[in-house]
Amino acid sequence: MKVLQILPELDSGGVERGTLEVAARLVDDGHESLVISNGGRLVAALENAGSRHIQMPVHRKALASLAEIPRLRKLFAKEKPDIIHVRSRLPAWLTWSAWKSMDRRTRPRFVTTVHGFYSVNAYSAVMTRGEAVIAVSQSVRDYILTNYPQTDPAKIRVIHRGVDERVYPTGFTPANDWLAVWNAAHPGLEKRIPLLMPGRLTRWKGQPDFIRLIARLIALGQPVHGLIVGEPHPKKLAFLAEIKALAESLGVIGHLTFLGHRSDLREIMAISEIVYSLSTDPEAFGRVSLEALALGKPVIAYDHGGVAEQLRPIFPQGLVKLGDLESAIDLTGKILKGRARPLSIKDFTLARMLDSTLAVYRTVLTRPR
């Protein structure tokens, strides 16, 4: 089986990581893996794992991108993949436009993955045009059927994103060298209780609620310290200044550390007592929360979207009503006192995700054209 995955770029993020994971599994199983993107820092890792990469500007939202359609059609005819798997809207439009003009009897099978709650319009509808459509959560499946009711429910397969338990083992402890560097960079933190808020710095991710939570816990006498991991989009740097001003106004700027982008989030989660997901809009999935649960860390999250789907079978006591900060504060105290721990992530493993994805490929290949 030859599988061609297409996405805008290979820099960082859940879509990109999932692409590399599927590619590596294909190679390990003896299949041929090819990825088209505009490139990025993950290309080397992709190629080192045995896949081929073809760089094309499939990321540009411009009229010039239409020139890629005949190039893609020519490439599909040359490479003859069995499966084309697209993971983003612009590449999906370019791919679909090239694919639909090919001979129906011999063209590759067309698979899409809906990774998020896209704005509802004709542009986003292309993600439902796959001969098989993968939804990364039940919430995303519901979004598809609610907003694109013409989509055949039978062709949608829910495949939750998965975590590699070898990389995120329960009870993981950072290396001594890492701990030494961390403690030197953050003196005195070992005397506090670290609480972690990971995620891109943007309003809907919930950092303001986390800062208010830290302020209330400090007022209640809890010796906590908030760790905020993530950076804002370059065009939204004002939000970082805004939440720092909020921390100043609440008198807790000294009880927070803004860590920016980190490549050692696993280690930071491991030394944190609780990890938070306080997004005011539902997450399509929320992979970082699952990684924390895999490490055995309690997660406190608002009860909606893909994160709630993870917590219900693994750590249901970590769910609080959307916006109910008082309940999140009370729950924090109870967890710190009782040291509750999540159950196994057995239904959300990387192996299960990859098995299910390859099963979709095999199934769509057997369907009538």
Which residue ranges define each predicted feature?
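Acidic donor-binding loop of glycosyltransferase active sites
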Residues: 270-284
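Active-site donor-binding acidic/aromatic loop of nucleotide-activated sugar
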Residues: 235-240, 253-262, 268, 319
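Short hydrophobic beta-strand element within catalytic cores of glycosyltransferases
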Residues: 35, 298-301
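Short, structured helix-loop element that forms part of the nucleotide-activated donor/catalytic region
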Residues: 41-47, 227-253
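A conserved, positively charged/aromatic
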Residues: 100, 104-138, 150
